[in-house]
Amino acid sequence: MSLFRRDGRRQETMSLTAEHVSFRYDARRESAAEFALHDVSVAVQRGSLTGLLGPNGCGKTTLLRLMAGVLQPGQGSVTLNGRSLREIPRRELARQVAVVPQETHPAFDYTVLEMTLMGRHPHLGLMQLEGPDDIAIAHESLAATGTADLAHRAFATLSGGEKQRVVIASALAQSSSVLLLDEPTASLDLAYQLEVASLLSRLNRDRGVTMVLATHDLNLAAALCDSLVLLRAGRVIAQGPPRDVLTAPLVQQLYNVEADVRFHDAAGHLTVVPIRRAR
């Protein structure tokens, strides 16, 4: 059994869509101002890397939780390959959509291999994950994230960048076709940010993994993402390719930045995105 086809790409890919989704944490309140998300529509194309941008409290994490099926929308729907998440059994959904949290603090002193094995079947205990297929896929996931040589190290002893790569390996071990990543580089220094960014780019480009990335980092979003969704106060205020979204006046006002976005060739591929604070 293998996670990937012979050409290195995922066995299958999924499309994920939120349509006119609204959500509030306190459903008893009727005021529209209490909505964490209001009439949000986002289409994540299979094999793409979509970035969710916006300030704290704008709804990025809430949208990720809805896409993971952890929360259910009060209005609208979230679908995976045209099928409502409400109709997909929890265990089946967990095998198709994996969540990579901002930070991971395991309760016990697991090894890297054990952490990855637990990602293989999120609803089962570690002792049930000793089958040869599970172990082979765990090792394959570690190899895909460049952490195979860490398999027998204690997770707690790793650097921040190593931990994040192992958490991504654990998500890959679920055999999921969609990864939802919540601020994957937020707590890392620059060297580890670049390390994780390079890994995500490689998994998306070479392995065909569909990703949705919530981040505050405009440079990360510009460098990695095919499309960006900008949220403010629970509403989508801009979305599209990075060259359109990052140069929009709304973005520059919201982040207090000036973005000099340069592209080359007719396809408009990104080459340089220096983003600096506006004076």
Question: Where are the language model's segments positioned?
Answer:
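Conserved structural motif at the start of ABC-family nucleotide-binding domains
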Residues: 16, 35-37
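The feature captures the beta-strand-to-loop junction immediately N-terminal to the Walker
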Residues: 53-55
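Helix-to-loop junction immediately C-terminal to a conserved catalytic motif
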Residues: 68
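Conserved ABC transporter NBD signature motif
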Residues: 76-84, 93
